[in-house]
């Protein structure tokens, strides 16, 4: 957007004065320049000096040459210096405020002053603290409020904030106007821009590889009616330096060029009242006017700061240009579709913003969080995170209203900022996926480890469900830890971050099985069945084993208890084997067992227990030795080598594991506890009927004892065990019928006895 020099000088009346050097020096330079300054400008300068404003000068500086050209001294000369140097403009004042590290960001106090005549009026004296100064400082960071920085200059200019503005403010605006140093200004298609340059100040010497940025933005408020001055409605933009004239293009020069500008309004649940008052001077005054409650911050910079201390991360394009992002504010930008359409039409027709009168201005709003409007003559914005556009082919200024709801509006701060920048360059890279992946992987590993420890603790309480958890020796536990770490590492490397979220319980169980199989492989043992719902290791296997004061005694105790694999129970102790023996499924095997037991019992009836044990041992040795000699002689005669005749029995595992012993002990303990409780209930007559039944049973056993001794009863029991199941299996129907009759008769007799005994109650 080109600036009209007359209006430009008038706009500076509210915030900047028009002279830095003494009046005599100004007169001399004015005469040397041919009196190019108009009477209107001189009158406004005198008015500004009478109002008590400090004198401010606009200076044009390059990287290797600096010359001061006053705003109201129209000197028709070229800027000397190397053509490769970069010229830039800065404002300076004789009145300097206290130097502070805080940049001028246009922050206004919320509770002290509202944006009224005090803030914007050009009339009345102002204190030095109220006037921002523009001094030459060091390089600026990317989050500076006002900065005017050359691409390669060691000395840059920045505007420091008022010391009173260091306080934390709740409502402020941030406007960032920046341009890439490698961007070339392009031809403006609007012909009205050339007509608006009737009065010019000067023109800077251009170079083809560098661009000249000159942006000045000011708001002046009429102190009589509180309205924005009608001749200050816009933001002037830069013009390309030229060799044939002074600082700005002459009316007879070629069409001006301006670089494309992207205006980004980004907000999240904030509100802004944007007004477009119509300028009474006609459509020749074009620009962007914001609401009067905004105190803007204007930044003209080519920042080179990539420091992480910046408030907002800079975005860097392919050419190395870094654009500082704006400060966030808690405001809501609102505009209606009708106003947006009218702005589009005005832009297409006049390449600028048409203004309305202050009486006709209206407030419109739109929710930036849910809409993404882009006004571009050439291309659309490539991405919502792109603070710069992607088109560098158009010479028109571009306005882009960008929404950030695609990047998680619910989680972000309620903030908004405006950015005026040149389009071009790739979008800033998002957060590194490797960082997110490493964080997710660490969280996932910690979660899996905690679940493994919890499951191991739960599994240790139910010992019968983990028959292999205690066989590991202490030396094998570091190997288990290595297996767990390798398993977690391989799982973390083979899955993405999204796969960690979808990892199911079934996959974790499979990993547990693989871990157990690896442990078994290291020990040289294998097992066929692994329960997936049972942890393969216990808490002691996950954590390093602590040494106790007992030392070797503790180690031997652990060695005696540790076991890894579930062992098959003994053949003669399994329930299935007992059923096969009782039902005579294998007649040979059942006959041997049944005969041996009866022989022992009958021997006990004739001999003592010690004699029976000795004789039985001698008989067993006689049989085995005889068979061993027989097989050896047979192999010698047949000249065969069949090996040991009892090799299959020798290889059979008959050792009892800790789990098996614990299992049988628990079963015996349960039976013992139930018997003790029942005897206590009967002898203490908790139930009289049950106690009487027990008494009758004991009375009948007296007769049985008189007829039979204990061994006889035991022999009868063994015979019954090996005979009754087979008989019942063959004659089940008849036996059930007779047993039913016997049960009925017994119940009838018991009922009659209970009826005759006084004080007894029939048990329901």
UniProtKB/Swiss-Prot annotation:
Superkingdom: Eukaryota
UniProtKB keywords: Endoplasmic reticulum, Membrane, Nucleus, Transmembrane, Transmembrane helix
Keyword Nucleus on entry: yes
GO cellular component: endoplasmic reticulum membrane; nucleus
Sequence ranges assigned to domain Reticulon in this UniProt record: 578-764
Pfam families, per the entry: Reticulon
PROSITE patterns: RETICULON (PS50845)
Region annotation Disordered: where it falls in the sequence: 1-37, 115-147, 247-400, 455-475
Subcellular location: Endoplasmic reticulum membrane; Nucleus
InterPro entries assigned to the protein according to its UniProt record, in alphabetical order: Reticulon (IPR003388), RTN1-4 (IPR046964)
Main location: endoplasmic reticulum
Compositionally skewed regions (Polar residues) per UniProt: 261-282
Topology term for the membrane: Multi-pass membrane protein
Residue spans of biased composition, Basic and acidic residues class: 328-337
Transmembrane segments: 607-627, 696-716
Function, as annotated: Inhibits amyloid precursor protein processing, probably by blocking BACE1 activity.
Name this polypeptide is given: Reticulon-1
């Amino acid at each position: 957007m080109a600036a009209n020099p007359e209006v430009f000088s008038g706009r500076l009346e509210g915030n900047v004065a028009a002279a830095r050097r003494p009046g005599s020096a100004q007169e001399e330079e004015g005469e040397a320049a041919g009196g190019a300054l108009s009477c209107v400008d001189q009158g406004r300068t005198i008015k500004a000096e009478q109002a008590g404003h400090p004198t401010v000068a606009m200076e044009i500086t390059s990287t290797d040459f600096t010359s001061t050209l006053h705003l109201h001294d129209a000197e028709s000369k070229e800027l000397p210096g190397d053509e490769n140097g970069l010229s830039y403009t800065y404002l300076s004042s004789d009145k300097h405020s206290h130097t502070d590290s805080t940049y001028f960001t246009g922050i206004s106090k919320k509770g002290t002053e509202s944006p009224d005549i005090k803030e914007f009026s050009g009339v009345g004296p102002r204190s030095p603290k109220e006037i921002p100064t523009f001094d030459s400082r060091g390089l600026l960071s990317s989050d500076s409020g006002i900065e005017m920085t050359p691409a390669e200059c060691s000395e840059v200019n920045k505007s420091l904030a008022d010391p009173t503005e260091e306080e934390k403010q709740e409502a402020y605006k941030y406007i960032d106007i920046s341009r890439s140093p490698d961007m070339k200004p392009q031809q403006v298609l609007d012909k009205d821009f050339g007509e608006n340059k009737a009065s010019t100040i000067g023109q800077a010497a251009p170079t083809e590889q560098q661009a000249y940025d000159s942006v000045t933005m000011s708001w002046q408020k009429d102190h009589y009616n509180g309205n924005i001055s009608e001749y200050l409605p816009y933001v002037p933009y830069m013009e390309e330096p030229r060799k044939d004239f002074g600082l700005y293009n002459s009316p007879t020069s070629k069409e001006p060029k301006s670089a494309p500008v992207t205006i980004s309004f980004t907000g999240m649940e904030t509100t802004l009242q944007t007004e477009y008052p119509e300028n009474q001077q006609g459509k020749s005054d074009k620009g962007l006017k914001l609401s009067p409650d905004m105190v803007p911050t204007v930044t003209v910079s080519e920042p080179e700061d990539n420091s992480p201390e910046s408030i907002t991360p800079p975005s860097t394009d392919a050419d190395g240009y870094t654009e500082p992002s704006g400060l966030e504010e808690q405001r809501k930008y609102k505009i209606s579709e009708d106003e947006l359409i009218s702005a589009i039409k005005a832009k297409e027709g006049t390449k600028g913003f048409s203004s309305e009168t202050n009486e006709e201005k209206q407030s419109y709003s739109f929710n930036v969080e849910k809409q993404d409007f882009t006004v571009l003559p050439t291309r659309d914005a490539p991405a919502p995170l792109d603070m710069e556009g992607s088109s560098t082919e158009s010479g028109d200024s571009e306005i882009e209203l960008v929404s950030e709801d695609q990047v998680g509006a619910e989680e972000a701060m309620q903030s908004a900022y405006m950015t005026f920048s040149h389009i071009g360059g790739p979008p800033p890279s998002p957060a590194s996926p490797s960082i997110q992946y490493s964080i997710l992987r660490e969280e996932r590993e910690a979660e899996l480890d905690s679940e493994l420890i919890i499951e191991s603790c739960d599994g240790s309480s139910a010992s019968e469900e983990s028959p292999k958890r205690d066989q590991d020796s202490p030396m094998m536990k570091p190997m288990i830890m290595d297996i767990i770490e390798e398993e977690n590492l391989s799982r973390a490397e083979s899955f993405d971050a999204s796969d960690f979220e979808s990892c199911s319980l079934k996959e974790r169980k499979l990993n547990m099985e693989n871990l157990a199989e690896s442990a078994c492989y290291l020990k040289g043992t294998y097992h066929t069945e692994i329960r997936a719902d049972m942890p393969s290791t216990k808490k002691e296997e996950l954590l390093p084993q602590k040494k106790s004061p007992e030392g070797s005694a503790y180690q031997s105790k652990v060695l005696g208890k540790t076991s890894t694999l579930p062992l098959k129970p003994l053949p003669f102790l399994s329930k299935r084997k007992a059923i096969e023996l009782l039902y005579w499924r294998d007649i040979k095997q059942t006959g041997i067992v049944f005969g041996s037991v009866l022989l022992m019992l009958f021997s006990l009836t004739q001999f003592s227990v010690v004699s029976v044990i000795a004789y039985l041992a001698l008989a067993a040795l006689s049989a085995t030795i005889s068979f061993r000699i027989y097989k050896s002689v047979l192999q010698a005669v047949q000249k065969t080598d069949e090996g040991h005749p009892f090799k299959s029995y020798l290889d059979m595992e008959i050792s009892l594991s800790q789990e098996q012993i614990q299992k049988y002990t628990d079963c015996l303990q349960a039976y013992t506890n139930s018997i003790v409780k029942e005897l206590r209930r009967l002898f203490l007559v908790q139930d009289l009927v049950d106690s009487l039944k027990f008494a009758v049973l004991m009375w009948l056993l007296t007769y049985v004892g008189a007829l039979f001794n204990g061994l006889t009863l035991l022999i009868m029991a063994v015979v019954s065990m090996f005979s009754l199941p087979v008989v019942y299996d063959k004659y089940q129907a008849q036996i059930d019928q007779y047993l039913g009759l016997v049960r009925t008769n017994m119940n009838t007799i018991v009922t009659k006895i209970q009826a005759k005994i006084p004080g007894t109650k029939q048990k329901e």
